[in-house]
Amino acid sequence: MGFAVVRTNREFVRPSAATPPSSGELLELSIIDRVVGLRHLVRSLHIFSAAAPSGGDAKPSPARVIKEALGKALVDYYPFAGRFVDGGGGPGSARVECTGEGAWFVEAAAGCSLDDVNGLDHPLMIPEDDLLPDAAPGVHPLDLPLMMQVTEFSCGGFVVGLISVHTMADGLGAGQFINAVGDYARGLDRPRVSPVWAREAIPSPPKLPPGPPPELKMFQLRHVTADLSLDSINKAKSAYFAATGHRCSTFDVAIAKTWQARTRALRLPEPTSRVNLCFFANTRHLMAGAAAWPAPAAGGNGGNGFYGNCFYPVSVVAESGAVEAADVAGVVGMIREAKARLPADFARWAVADFREDPYELSFTYDSLFVSDWTRLGFLEADYGWGPPSHVIPFAYYPFMAVAIIGAPPVPKTGARIMTQCVEDDHLPAFKEEIKAFDK
């Protein structure tokens, strides 16, 4: 049975008041922002149940509330209302032109309730593309920092579909912006966290001569979504504490199990074959004291409102046999060791003490890339109807084995693993390995 979604209005939402820069001013991006691989679209759905608006007062439709709040937030976050422009060096020389043309906003209505589509839990009963904004006229999607669609359901619930360009903001920065929209939607006079541009504060070490562009082999990767129970996660945490005397996070456990399950499923012929894990660690706390870096403030994320890209790729390399044979606590240990190296590795990168650029990644089938969506602020965003029941990211690419750690829909607990990381030959074994974690 199909459920129709009808788009009822499309427009560019401009800042609702004058913004600081003069029209056409160009803002420089940081060396991390300008990593060519970040010039891509990040797509996600944010599902809000039919709970009554907080405060008890009758309110207009969610789409109208959010559209008005977006216009206010774009005054503070005016670069989101601009456009990316490339210099002579292509995407690697991009800047933001503060045109004030606005963010693309689409209003839509679904001819069903959220219950009719199982709360948009996995698997989706409405195609994701119906709930994400369609293309804006006259502008390339990769030049437009933000697109948003609000789809209202017959029950009063709604879905916010977001498409943003990673060049503007990392996950924490995007979450900070979305929470600012929520602050205005709930009637606040200003966002709880004031935005800071400060891209010049990010280290800019001399780049190595660029090598040839990476060869991107396309894989036939399959989607797998699985939930890890809170009980199983806590057991793994306890086992790690018993073995080491140290604590670990839910993220540590979830990626350890996912990496181990995938490695076992690959059945590499030699136990000495190398397998790789990569995740992206926030480095705002490592910027404290750097020139031009703003001091932390209450309610900030370690950078007093900095919303640009401020992360470092953390890599774990091990022999496949070691990953397969270890218990989950042992794999967690490998991950924790890599995390412990982060301050030193980031400091070396900042002063150009490296032989290979850590931001130039290699995409091979023996490499797994992991992203954590539980700590970005999206699960706390509130437009006046309470926080979302769950968030569904779509950060998948055919050349890149990916696992995203999220949260299952409330009231479920534990962790949700959303992956596109194995081909058909390895799919059954991967599913069985993931399932075995909860036995």
Swiss-Prot record:
Active site per the UniProt annotation: 166, 382
Entries under Pfam families matching the protein: Transferase (PF02458)
Any one GO BP annotation for this protein: lignin biosynthetic process
Annotated EC: 2.3.1.-
Enzyme class (EC, first level): transferase
Keyword tags: Acyltransferase, Lignin biosynthesis, Transferase
Organism superkingdom: Eukaryota
Keyword DNA-binding found: no
InterPro entries xrefs: CAT-like_dom_sf, Plant_acyltransferase
An annotated Gene Ontology molecular function: hydroxycinnamoyltransferase activity
Known role: Grass-specific monolignol p-coumaroyl transferase involved in the biosynthesis of acylated monolignols or monolignol conjugates that serve as monomer precursors of lignin. Can synthesize sinapyl p-coumarate, p-coumaryl p-coumarate, sinapyl caffeate and p-coumaryl caffeate in vitro.
Similarity remark: Belongs to the plant acyltransferase family.
Protein name from the UniProt record: Acyl transferase 4
Source organism of the structure: Oryza sativa subsp. japonica (Rice)
Gene coding for it: AT4
